[in-house]
Amino acid sequence: MSNKIMKTSRLTAEDINGAWTIMPTPSTPDASDWRSTATVDLEETARIVEELIAAGVNGILSMGTFGECATLTWDEKRDYVSTIVETIRGRVPYFCGTTALNTREVIRQTRELIDIGANGTMLGVPMWVKMDLPTAVQFYRDVADAVPEAAIAIYANPEAFKFDFPRPFWAEMSKIPQVVTAKYLGIGMLDLDLRLAPNIRFLPHEDDYYAAARINPERITAFWSSGAMCGPATAIMLRDEVVRAKSTGDWAKAKAISDDMRAADSTLFPRGDFSEFSKYNIGLEKARMDAAGWLKAGPCRPPYNLVPEDYLAGAQKSGKAWAALHAKYSNELK
């Protein structure tokens, strides 16, 4: 059977709304062994996708940092994306991830995964050599020119990509039609970036969504969620309450959910340090998810499979807190 799934026209920013969940790449028990060659649990992958769609998520992102884009083989990536596309069957939009170390490899992977059926790619810049602004801008222009049918989500993580994604960058990205959205960290410069990039749907982190939506209710209509991998009910509840608050002016419930999320995340970051967290991002996120019990993330692929035990304890505590929130808000959604 062909892996190809018929797609509609390229996504636009207007298609990006609601709760966008970022998936891990579930692993087999032997995934931490470098000798292993087929480490993706495809059955669990399909189950997670079905459960996310049943829960009501608006879109799915994959193969970012804790999605282990950096440590999957090309065969594993193709099998994983094929499974997701075949499971989704066009019911929600899906961005794969094709970040790599050079433009030609990014284009090759993007072409193949879009051909399989992904709607777009979540894409960071190559990071072996630190990029300046003109190089980063040209990189995205080249990918857009090479794969014009692919929607692009800018993966704006300064820690991962050694690039600050400065204000002029966003102004240039807004000129590329394929760039429709961005996985966005922090909201200190959000108001300015919204003005510089009027054609891009910025996705703040779920912890920041309430505050971001208050900054600009019309433009901020979607967010990215990793906590949903501990159970999606909290993210769905936040989405719905922000929509309601925009209509009624009563933001109290949305703020309460946001506060719950922040509290659950409080032990995830070692010493409250995002830079330290970023060294162990994959292991900490997968430990959080496994502790929550909603999915089976499985062991990390090498070389990123070593994490300090005390850091893991904080991640596991966070996962259990998110599991409690999922139970709480599942009852409220009934």
From Swiss-Prot:
Q: Which domain of life is it from?
A: Bacteria
Single annotated GO MF: 4-hydroxy-tetrahydrodipicolinate synthase activity
Q: What is its EC number?
A: 4.1.2.45
One GO BP: catabolic process
EC category = lyase
The record's keywords, sorted A to Z, are: Aromatic hydrocarbons catabolism, Lyase, Plasmid, Pyruvate
General remark: Encoded on an unnamed 75 kb plasmid.
Q: Explain the purpose of this protein.
A: Involved in the naphthalene upper catabolic pathway. Catalyzes the transformation of trans-O-hydroxybenzylidenepyruvate (THBPA) to salicylaldehyde and pyruvate. The reaction is reversible.
| PANTHER family (UniProt xref) | 4-HYDROXY-2-OXOGLUTARATE ALDOLASE, MITOCHONDRIAL, DIHYDRODIPICOLINATE SYNTHASE
What the record says about family reads: Belongs to the DapA family.
Protein name, per record: Trans-O-hydroxybenzylidenepyruvate hydratase-aldolase
Species lineage: Bacteria, Pseudomonadati, Pseudomonadota
Q: Which gene does this sequence derive from?
A: doxI
